[in-house]
Amino acid sequence: MATLLSTERPRTGWRDYMELTKPKVVVLMLITSLVGMFLATRAGVAWSVLLFGNLGIGLCAGGAAVVNHVVDRRIDALMARTHKRPLAQGRVAPLPALAFALLLAVMGLALLLAFTNTLTAWLTLASLLGYAVLYTGFLKRATPQNIVIGGLAGAAPPLLGWVAVSGHVSAEPLLLVLIIFAWTPPHFWALAIHRKAEYEKADIPMLPVTHGEHYTALHILLYTLILLAVSLLPYAIHMSGPLYLACALALGLRFLHWAWVLYRGTRPHAAIKTFKYSIGYLFALFIALLVDHYLLLNL
């Protein structure tokens, strides 16, 4: 009886499937998508586009996250940060997880086709495939520049939100994509330094594993400088006003401070503190864009 119980697959619950979608990551993506929608127009955003457009983008992002869990299940089982994930622990089997991912993606694309436009659906599909297939299936295990090349897929949500409202691609949403693209390397490399031993154990060629922590910290510092410069471009092209400029400078200089601390190696736990700050940074920067947009409209 004891042997039977020990070999039994753990029970699967709805929370396991919810965890597979990486809801915290999806929420941050949807914030940038929402901002993209509101920045695309001087009028209000139609409630159907706002609700179903973001739901469609979120479902597709969740589907891509599920594929990531399936492909990475053996790696996840080796890492302290991820070993309790549903697939790593066997609470969800790979085939049901893939079926769930397909269902989410189909539902998401159907909503985008029904309530936004064809271009949004195509761009969302490209983003989904870029993350689930190109990054997860190939780049993550192939090169220490994995998150630089694959980061474009994760940077797409503000473009998707903008196109859902406007129906076309323009320079402004591409600039928002560029901000997230520049933000991605310092964000993930800071975590990779903190979790270097785990990535090494799982044989993932993250930059700290292949080139060392000091080299990685230098590149975090350089990318943070690039991010600071790029984050000022919305003001430079008159997309935003003085409020955004002040917020971008304050947030960016604080990010630069943490990148410098990490590079100097003078404080313990600087890597994880830099990683955590980067999350708040992106959230605050996009909220500043949104608030500034409506202030400009009322002037």
Curated annotation (Swiss-Prot):
The keyword Transferase applies. PANTHER family: 4-HYDROXYBENZOATE SOLANESYLTRANSFERASE, PROTOHEME IX FARNESYLTRANSFERASE, MITOCHONDRIAL. The chain crosses the membrane at residues 25-45, 47-67, 95-115, 119-139, 147-167, 173-193, 217-237, 243-263, 279-299. Pathway: Porphyrin-containing compound metabolism; heme O biosynthesis; heme O from protoheme: step 1/1. One of its GO terms (cellular component) is plasma membrane. It holds the Pfam family UbiA. The keyword Acetylation does not apply. Belongs to the UbiA prenyltransferase family. Protoheme IX farnesyltransferase subfamily. Converts heme B (protoheme IX) to heme O by substitution of the vinyl group on carbon 2 of heme B porphyrin ring with a hydroxyethyl farnesyl side group. Keywords: Cell inner membrane, Cell membrane, Heme biosynthesis, Membrane, Transferase, Transmembrane, Transmembrane helix. This is Protoheme IX farnesyltransferase 1.
